């Protein structure tokens, strides 16, 4: 039985990967009167007087909404909200299993930005944070931006920022392996969608050198026609040498390649034109180039999104800890500084003794990672003065 059929069978057996569990059993009349009526009226009155008590008198302080419109689910595309539910349930299970964070899946049946933003904003008082998931670009940029403006809790599009953080951590350690210098690197990112643009912006914020963005038409340059808002924004701060051409042209002389695009776009010959290349081919399930092919082309470090190859670059190492730390200090937002701190903390988990070309990140199954990321994020929030607890 292949993995798809085995997964389907497991889902049929489980009939859902998460459940609601009461934190206190209701067995006596006293239990009933304290946890529900009449006693529950008192915490209601307290919250009505002091809104902040909604975080201390309810589970809100540890509850994240995982929300999709089903428009960009995995590599399946626009399959609709109901079909996106298995992924949202899985995400919630990972939140709990790796970060101890309670999460609830919500699949919203609209592609209209106004309706989606309004719906999420209206239910936001039930949660301590919002994790946006599998919303297609470029709408995802506007949805996140507008929600940040109207919600008083952190809003985080994991496809963008979780991916960017784990890629940044992987690059930091690939630099340690190869001896490359951050400010002198040329990094080519193929795929100018949600993940690619977020990766580019974070790497630029961290001080990485020349970031060159590519899409299906090749290198993105400032002034190109037909760019969406996200691509237009990053075109102003990337490609500082004003290069033109195809992906192969961009890779010539590059130090690193980050692929968040489509299978089999890169060849060994293209990798051979790089300088001691770092290759992160993250298209799933088939990467832009297979690891053995990249190494045949001379790649020094290779990572993919898959668990069956070394150096899995998976954002499960990021989002549980990001939210755990943010919720712990009740920060209203997840800032650029908190993302950078998370990336550096994740990279630092790999010691000099452990570090090698085939080991640049901790295991995606290492449950200590979330605590490390959470502590770093919480400390950064305190230092920035945005912690409320």
Model feature map: region roles:
Residues 55-60, 96-97, 122-124, 148-149, ...:
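Solvent-exposed alpha-helices and their adjacent loops that cap or buttress functional pockets
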Residues 69-71, 79, 108-109, 134-137, ...:
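Short, ordered loop/turn segments at secondary-structure junctions
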Residues 74, 79-99, 151, 157, ...:
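Glycine-rich phosphate/diphosphate-binding loop of Rossmann-like nucleotide-binding domains
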Residues 232-300, 306-308:
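Rossmann-like adenosine-cofactor binding region
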